[in-house]
């Protein structure tokens, strides 16, 4: 029996609404925005403004995620990886999830516009629309380039973090944006390779489903090379110091090695696809930490 309409404790309801915001992704986005803000000010950041930026970014990200779960509820019910989300398991009515997502989006714009600055608010709104509409509604079910083009949504928080403390944008935050943009395909496709059967069942045109493992792996290597070049280019903006380079270079080598090994393994074997996915998470954590300690 569906849980919608049955008794749910207040704690269960709160937990379900929190799950709608995809908190793990939200934390990663908050981390990258914090890194950008710290690099922009070389550590001399206004922590009150930083706090409001965090709140606004979290509201924007969480609201877009809720809209995503509302729209994708049919897919989520099919895929084993997502069947435990609040809407498929009946914890939240779809219409309420949609209204919740819209509310968070509006609150995000107000918080960022009033308490941070207008540029940050417009960037937050752009990120919200990018993920909730452009990626979720337009791209995800229509093209294998869904996460390539949609990767910009996950990269927006670095622009938000930088703009929050400077009121402007420059080459450095754009390169930080591109780091996440180029990181997204090998990260997402590594997961899609070993979850290929689920995406096929749900009729989601991920790259492995449409173009096959061989093409997906080859493109993953290309994007990792672009990622390598972009992350090194950041050093030459003088936004980060030599310590960043000392950490970023070997981290890029490791990640590139993983994607090459993934490309070399048999298409029905996923050992290196899983390792590449793991190293992609390590990569983003280490490289953005290196930006902060090496500025």
Predicted regions and their residues:
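Membrane-embedded alpha-helical segments that form the functional core of polytopic membrane enzymes
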Residues: 31-73, 81, 122-133, 173-183
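Intramembrane alpha-helical segments
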Residues: 94-165
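Interfacial loop-to-transmembrane junctions
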Residues: 256-286
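Transmembrane alpha-helical segments that form the membrane-embedded catalytic/substrate-channel core
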Residues: 59-67, 130-136, 178-196, 228, ...
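Small-residue-rich segments of transmembrane alpha-helices in multi-pass membrane proteins
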Residues: 30-34, 85-86, 148-165, 214-215, ...
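Multi-pass membrane catalytic core of lipid/isoprenoid biosynthesis enzymes
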Residues: 81-122, 212-236
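Cytosolic, membrane-interface loops and tails of multi-pass inner-membrane proteins
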Residues: 2-14, 71-92, 189-217
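Hydrophobic alpha-helical transmembrane segments in multi-pass integral membrane proteins
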Residues: 159-169, 227-234, 282-295
């Amino acid at each position: 029996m569906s849980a919608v309409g049955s008794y749910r404790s207040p704690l269960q309801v709160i937990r379900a609404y929190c799950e709608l915001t995809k908190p793990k992704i939200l934390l990663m986005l908050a981390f990258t925005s914090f890194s950008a803000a710290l690099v922009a000010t070389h550590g001399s950041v206004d922590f009150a403004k930083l706090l409001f930026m965090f709140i606004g970014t979290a509201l924007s990200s969480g609201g877009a995620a809720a809209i995503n779960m509302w729209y994708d509820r049919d897919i989520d019910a099919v895929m084993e990886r997502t069947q435990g989300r609040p809407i498929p398991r009946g914890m939240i009515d779809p219409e309420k999830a949609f209204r919740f997502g819209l509310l968070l989006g509006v609150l995000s714009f107000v918080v960022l516009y009033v308490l941070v600055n207008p540029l940050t608010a417009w960037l937050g709104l752009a990120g919200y629309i990018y993920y909730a509409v452009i990626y979720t509604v337009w791209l995800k079910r229509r093209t294998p380039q869904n996460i390539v083009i949609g990767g910009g949504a996950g990269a927006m928080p670095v622009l938000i973090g930088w703009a929050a403390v400077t009121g402007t944008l420059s080459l450095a935050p754009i390169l930080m944006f591109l780091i996440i943009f180029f990181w997204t395909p090998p990260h997402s496709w590594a997961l899609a390779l070993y979850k290929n059967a689920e995406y096929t069942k749900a009729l989601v045109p991920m790259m492995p489903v449409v173009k096959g493992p061989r093409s997906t792996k080859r493109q993953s290597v290309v994007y990792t090379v672009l990622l390598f070049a972009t992350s090194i280019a950041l050093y030459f903006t003088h936004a980060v110091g030599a310590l960043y380079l000392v950490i970023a270079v070997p981290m890029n080598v490791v990640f590139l090695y993983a994607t090459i090994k993934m490309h070399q393994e048999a298409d029905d074997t996923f050992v290196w696809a899983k390792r590449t996915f793991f190293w992609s998470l390590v990569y983003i954590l280490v490289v953005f930490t290196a930006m902060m300690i090496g500025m």
